[in-house]
Design a protein with these regions (language model features):
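Extracellular/periplasmic carbohydrate-active domains that bind, remodel
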Residues: 1-518
């Protein structure tokens, strides 16, 4: 067992207890800072320290299971400390503080920190700048404006003078469509940190954001945090809740750290995904606690227009020690993935009563740049997940999703609009109280799934399981306690895969090529 520093910032730091367990340690542990107790009973593998001093050396200690572990670190330097309350903030939860907060953010010198003290600050869209830190003190709440007419509209596409080049400023569900600016906007900047123990509360339930959510009114709905075309971005420690739509939505971001923070949206709030990186590179999602009304983490890469034009995949992703709770899917790939999703490793995550666990969703029409490959899921625990493993290449999204082109079960010509699924590896996974299906792999007949490898996987069904839809595709029967279903897969390797409590035959295969089991 080791104690490691994930990242230090100017006034905060985040650490990880390397114990090989999913999200939580076997027993609570004590955390000290320079010999003084900070947490008496820490119950998560990833933890953070706040209210530190910049440019200062500290020693953090952990007493865990009879072991004493220490880690010495130095916080980042800070040039200036900007107290936003000096800009005339009114912390009554009603007064509009948008211009005052924006003034603090805009005038912060390079290398400085904008500090927001405890209080409830009503605000509309805020825009962060390069080389700055936004620190939300414990008890500080940035409360979103309820009136959509107060929000700026960001055009999806900005044309150039030569009328050839285009700049993509925002998007909606994979297309460059005009949308309202988010509560926090990180646009074309670099080296930005948002940290602290405060809260971003979009307050969407008290507006009209969740009413007729699929209808565009003025512009498409905003995100809680929207980041576009930026580099070296970090979100840490805060709580983000009651989002208008997707909660954290980075597009074309390189080197993105999402560390040890909370996302809370009501389960019935429409399209309130937790984290949706779109065509991003070098992503770390570590120690995040997500409770949402849609997919918890969904890796995306645009729809066919941007995906095939820009060919920007979502790649080099690490997801570790996260709690994924009660969403539609735990870890999801797609369905907007026309640029491709590659090289993702998920470890030590706990999925608790999500509808599906590891979920891949795509369809004809995403394009031949829509390649999913190099996905590894290892050391994951699922509790009460209805369908632990789902790969669905007939996903019925978009206006034509129920049409014959998407849903036809006969082989169609492989062309420039045909997506491809490569290699998926699943190892050392335990899923208890499943309901619909343990494994449901549904590839295209003209472009079968290349390879599925499972090793040391145990799935146990809930004795009181109810039937349901394992994959969102037409003409698929409701299933209950279905062990392994696979259709149109080139290769399946099962090594020490145990399924308990299933009904009927264990294997339901159609058009499966090489199959190996031991």
């Amino acid at each position: 067992m080791n104690l490691s520093l994930i990242r230090s910032m100017t006034r905060s730091a985040v650490f990880e207890l390397e114990n090989g367990l999913c999200y939580r340690p076997a027993h609570p542990f004590t955390v000290t800072l320079n010999g003084k107790t900070v947490y008496e009973a820490c119950q998560t593998n990833v933890f953070s320290l706040f209210s530190l001093l910049p440019g200062t050396e500290y020693t953090v200690g952990v007493q865990a299971e009879g072991e004493s572990l220490t880690c010495t670190f130095t916080t980042e330097a800070e040039t200036f400390f900007v107290d936003a309350s000096r800009y005339g903030l009114v912390a009554d939860g009603t007064t509009d503080n948008t211009l005052k907060l924006q003034a603090a953010l805009s005038t912060c010198p390079k290398g400085g920190t904008v500090y927001v003290p405890a209080g409830r600050y009503r605000t509309c869209s805020l825009f962060l700048k390069s080389n700055t830190t936004l620190y939300l003190e414990k008890g500080a709440v940035l409360l979103g404006d309820n009136d959509r007419t107060h929000y700026p509209i960001l055009p999806g596409v900005i044309p150039s003078e030569n009328e050839v080049d285009e700049y993509y400023l925002t998007g909606w569900e994979g297309n460059p469509l005009s949308s309202f600016a988010g509560l926090l906007n990180i646009t074309q900047v670099h080296d930005v940190v948002v940290t602290g123990e405060g809260t971003l509360d979009c307050d969407a339930e008290n507006g009209d954001w969740w009413v007729t959510p699929k209808i565009k009114r003025i512009a498409w709905r905003p995100r809680a945090v929207a980041a576009v075309d930026s580099e070296n971005i970090c979100l840490h420690g805060i709580t983000v809740q009651n989002s208008y739509s997707w909660t954290i939505h980075p597009i074309f971001v390189k080197h993105l750290d999402l560390l040890n923070f909370n996302i809370n949206n009501p389960y019935n709030a429409p399209n309130t995904d937790g984290i949706d990186p779109e065509s991003c590179e070098h992503i770390r999602i570590i120690g995040v606690n997500i409770h949402v009304g849609d997919d918890c983490i969904a890796m995306k890469a645009s729809k066919v227009f941007l995906g095939m034009k820009l060919k920007k995949s979502c790649e080099h992703t690490v997801i570790r020690n996260c709690l994924l709770d009660k969403g539609h899917g735990g870890i999801v790939i797609g369905s907007e993935m026309s640029g491709g999703v590659k090289d993702m490793v998920v470890t030590q995550c706990l999925m608790d009563h999500t509808d599906r666990g590891l979920r891949v969703k795509t369809r004809r029409g995403r394009g031949n740049t829509a390649v999913i490959d190099g996905l590894v899921f290892r050391n994951v625990e699922m509790r009460g997940v209805k369908a632990p493993f789902v790969i669905n290449m007939f996903y019925f999204c978009d206006p034509d999703g129920h049409g014959p082109y998407v849903q036809c079960r006969d082989a169609m010509p492989v062309d420039e609009y045909t997506p491809k699924l490569g290699s998926l590896t699943m190892e050392d996974i335990v899923a208890t109280d499943a309901q619909f299906a343990g494994c449901y792999f549904d590839g295209l007949p003209e472009q079968p799934i290349e390879r599925v490898s499972m090793k040391n996987v145990t799935i146990t069904f809930d004795p009181n399981a109810e039937a349901g839809q394992a994959a969102m595709a037409d003409n698929r029967p409701l299933v209950k306690k279905l062990a392994i279903y696979a259709e149109n897969v080139k290769e399946i390797d099962l090594h020490n895969v145990k399924i308990e409590g299933y009904e009927g035959e264990r294997l339901h295969f159609a058009n499966v090529g090489h199959f190996e089991e031991d």
